[in-house]
Amino acid sequence: MPSNSTPANEEKEEESEKIQKSPVDTPHTPNGSVSDNEENETSSTGEVTRCVCGIVESDDEASDGGLYIQCDQCSVWQHGNCVGFADESEVPEVYYCEICHPEFHKVYQRGRGAKQSKYLGNGKPIEASQTEESSSTPPSPATKKSSKQRLTMNSRDAALDYEEYLAIAKEKSLIPRRSRGRTSSKSLSPPAPQDESQGTEINLKQKIEEENDEILEDSKESKDENEENKETSTTNVAETDAPEEETVDTVEEIADEEKHSVKEESGEASPQSSQQSTITSISTTTRSTRKAKREAAAEDKADLPAAVAPKPSKTRKVGGRRGKSSSNDNHRIPQLHPDGTFVETITKPKGLHSRITMTEMRRRVASMLEYIGHIQVEMAAQSAGNQSSTKSSKEGPEEEKETLRMVDNLTRDLLHWEQRFSRT
């Protein structure tokens, strides 16, 4: 059983018992106290102090009167503070040193200080034995004197484990779980009842702030959605206006062409009636062919389904005429005539919108590939006819080779684009 007094006090008590009583052999009692013979033997051999901190003393007079605790197996004395016991109330009924039972000790060292241990053995504090011994033994002058405290502030802090310190700090709300950049470094005193009310107020404020943030985010999202809806509505309106603009363009083009044809007829008029008849016939045929082409294109667009039909192109107002570009924008594109000759025709390109869709691009690429295929077939037929008839000059084949190479490069680029952006 661990002793609650110093070795010097126990030696004095043993000497007084020797004078009053004769040595009698008594068996080992169940509460862990030794017999008088064993006490005489231990007193004759001397007490041994072997602590975790590394101090080994065999002289009893070297003790400073602090708290000591004895191992129940090897009867070695150790410093109570070095083993993790600051008061006598914390001492268990049964104690074993770190050599007899190392599993009960958790030895640690802080910096360059002495080693210390934390006793992990389970036991109840010996309050009853303390009261009995205090009532049986009179207070000695050594106990009346103030005991020398060997522990400094650093060693006292080191006696506490870091995990225990964190647990105590959390219990006393020194480390708030949710803090917005503000830390409270107050004393370790227990929190006052006002702290709970303050904590509830802080939690309420945090909840209110979070709700306000959510409301602001929702409002921003709704504004973004409204702006997107406005943009889509404006694009739809522009698309609906586009067919009207195209119809106006076609009417103006027809009027210009008629005026141009009339001027040509008036300028090229001759006294010969045969020439006038030929000119008028040519103009009528050109008009009829143009009308037929337009009607065929309109029928093709009507026959196409809604998903495949091309979307009307968007045009912008330039000057006073809607969607009408200048004459400089017209381009001359060579087309193959059935007779085998290339004829340049004036075409007006449609301006591509900056926000064209991928489906429109795919449709245009497909139409371009189809057109290039027709051109390649016609060029192959033309080259075969020329070779069979007569030998052409050197310039002709070179030009054809150049055009064929350009067509091949264009088809290669279009196929590469189609493979990259095709639907998966």
From Swiss-Prot:
Determine if Metal-binding is one of this entry's keywords: yes
Query: Which residue intervals are annotated with compositional bias (Basic and acidic residues) in the record?
Result: 257-266, 294-303, 392-405
Report whether Cytoplasm shows up as a keyword of the record: yes
Q: Where are the zinc fingers (PHD-type)?
A: 48-103
Query: Where is the PTM Phosphoserine found along the chain?
Result: S187
Where would you find this protein in the cell?
A: Cytoplasm; Nucleus
**In this UniProt entry, which cysteines form S-S bonds?**
none
The record's keywords, sorted A to Z, are: Chromatin regulator, Cytoplasm, Metal-binding, Nucleus, Phosphoprotein, Zinc, Zinc-finger
| Sequence ranges of Acidic residues compositional bias | 241-256
Gene3D superfamilies, per database record? Zinc/RING finger domain, C3HC4 (zinc finger)
Name this protein carries in UniProt: Putative histone deacetylase complex subunit cti6
Q: Name one GO molecular function term.
A: methylated histone binding
